């Protein structure tokens, strides 16, 4: 949360905010988010790898570490995950691979996913369908 994280929380609480969701965008950010989670204080975490950072995530190397994070108390979602075909900071096939792995992880753990979608509507819907998502 940075140097003034406590001040930010205090101002938010004074304004009536009672719950916070801290999202991870890399494996390291997700570790930080999970460490900040304190359900008794209304602080929760989402762990994930943003599509810009997908190039740095290898499921075979990082998957067990990530899944252990996702199982920690106070982690309530997988995210921010998805596809970003506007900037292409990570190759599109890699973005899709990581998204589908993260969706599988969310399904295994029974957690919702926080999705990022930029200029990838058809592709993200196809990935969701491949991973068993359905309309309610």
Give names to the regions the model predicted.
Residues 1-136:
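Mid-domain alpha/beta scaffold segments of enzyme catalytic cores
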